[in-house]
Regions:
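Conserved PLP-binding catalytic core of the aspartate aminotransferase-like
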Residues: 26, 303-311, 318-356, 372, ...
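Conserved N-terminal alpha-helix of the aminotransferase class I/II PLP-enzyme fold
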Residues: 64-112
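N-terminal "arm"/small-domain region of PLP-dependent enzymes with the aminotransferase-like
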Residues: 8-76, 210
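Active-site PLP attachment segment
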Residues: 232-267
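PLP-dependent enzyme catalytic core of the Aspartate aminotransferase-like
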Residues: 60, 68, 72, 96, ...
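Active-site phosphate-binding strand-loop segment of PLP-dependent enzymes
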Residues: 153, 157-214
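Conserved PLP-anchoring active-site segment centered on the Schiff-base-forming lysine
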Residues: 120-139, 160
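Structural motif of enzymes handling amino- and sulfur-group chemistry
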Residues: 280-299, 305, 309, 318-323
């Protein structure tokens, strides 16, 4: 049998519908300056789908730093992996500043966040070790766990009773062996907006022996007094053995870092395959990230504006009776309960985008249980009160249409809209 034959009629739950909704629900094109309002299909929309939490993507100081660095160095310098020929004083300065910011002795730059996490997990454990991880962990964690040749146990999301149960299993398994236990969770979960119970997990170190690895992609820059993340917010940063974040969210950039004890970071620097065998972060990104970190540290008003918008948006949704779960972070899920199928889902999103000019992410099966529908909003520092008020009014109206079964049982006329946008 041809290896590729299995892909002819089975493209996955989303890919199977690709021909019905190309360029609209999947692979949409947002155009113009990265902002609270952007162009989609030829019309301006309020955009709630970008993780530009602090508005740094188009901050004038950031744009200047990026442009100046690109003009001076181009995109190629430095060439090669860090360990061979791709290191620089600026790479090391960024690592030093990141370590100081999150209160760790050392930090290591990653040329990309997702594969950095995958590679780090692969590098930290052997077949003798056991991984214990949260059930709602991000895909980069799940992919890293899949590479593990030893045992792995998953605990129910933020369920400390089940965590203790899995830790007992893991402890029994490594007893009398050269193996140890790596616990992996998130500081802020990107779908639900829940914070990981880092403080409670760390307290369990009194009962179990393990090391804690935290992915704080959504917490870095948004949580804690200074923006140093979920560990700072919960007052337990010292108990996090390895702290990870990408630059793709609050920093609005590319790359990432891991922070922790110097001896562990030294091991990763010399052994982490995604860094040892790949080109280092280009200089414009390094200098641009230095500027972004500087603004994150020196302009608290950016985080204050973000949280003004978070409170206004989430408070307004709750006042109108929307279920936004138990989020206590900027990530804002809106759950629309009922037995919603593909037709209702696509009609609702089409209505929001075409008639209310609102662009947000939609999440459905298999990410959440079948029949449910979740709209995910990411408020940022560049959103306005008007953006929020228009969105609240729109959500109230489309929910009423959904409840009254107003939407037709067919796919929306996306092709006609797309054709009009190209005229």
């Amino acid at each position: 049998m041809d290896l590729f034959a299995k892909f002819e009629n089975q493209l996955g739950p989303i890919g199977n519908e690709a021909d019905k909704v190309p360029g609209y629900f999947s692979f949409p094109k947002l155009e113009g300056e990265i902002a609270n309002r952007m162009m989609f299909q030829g019309k301006e929309r309020i955009v709630w789908s970008l993780n530009n939490y602090l508005g740094l993507a188009n901050h004038p100081e950031v744009r200047k730093a990026d442009a100046d660095a690109a003009a001076q160095y181009g995109l190629a310098y430095p060439m090669g992996a860090r360990m061979m020929s791709g290191n620089s004083n600026n790479h090391e300065l960024l690592e030093k500043n990141l370590a100081e910011f999150v209160g760790k002795p050392d930090a290591m730059l990653l040329n990309y966040g997702y594969q950095g996490m995958v590679s780090a997990i692969d590098n930290l454990v052997t077949r003798h070790d056991v991984i214990v991880y949260d059930a709602e962990s991000h895909a980069c964690i799940l992919d890293g766990v899949r590479l593990h040749a030893g045992k792995r146990y998953v605990f129910k999301h933020n369920d400390m009773e089940d965590f203790a149960k899995q830790m007992k299993r893991a402890t029994a398994l490594v007893e009398g062996t050269p193996g140890g236990i790596l616990v992996i969770t998130e500081g802020v979960f990107g779908m639900s907006g829940n914070m990981g119970k880092l403080d409670e997990i760390i307290k369990m170190k009194d009962q179990f022996e393990f090391r804690l690895f935290v992915d704080d992609a959504h917490g870095f820059g948004t949580m804690g007094k200074t923006g140093a993340g979920a560990g700072e917010e919960l007052g337990c940063m010292d108990g996090i053995d390895l702290y990870f974040s990408t630059f793709a969210k609050s920093m609005a950039s590319i790359g990432g870092f891991i922070a922790g004890e110097t001896k562990i970071l030294k091991f990763l620097r010399y052994n982490m395959r995604s860094q040892v065998f790949a080109k280092s972060l280009p200089m414009p990104l390094v200098l641009g990230n230095l500027k972004r970190l500087e603004l994150l540290r020196t302009k608290p008003e950016l985080k204050e504006k973000l949280w003004h918008n978070v409170r206004r948006l989430q408070g307004g949704l709750r006042e109108r009776g929307f279920d936004i779960g138990t989020t206590n972070t900027p990530v804002t899920p809106v759950f629309l309960h009922g037995n919603h199928d593909l037709y209702e889902t696509t009609q609702l999103i089409f209505d929001l985008r075409e008639n209310y000019h609102i662009f947000c992410s939609v999440v459905m099966y298999p990410v959440i249980p079948k029949g449910q529908l979740m709209l995910r909003l990411i408020p940022t520092a560049v959103h306005t009160d008007q953006d929020i008020d228009e969105t609240l009014n729109a959500f109230t109206e489309v929910r009423e249409k959904l409840d009254n079964k107003t939407y037709p049982r067919e796919l929306p006329p996306i092709q006609s809209v797309a054709a009009a946008a190209t005229v």
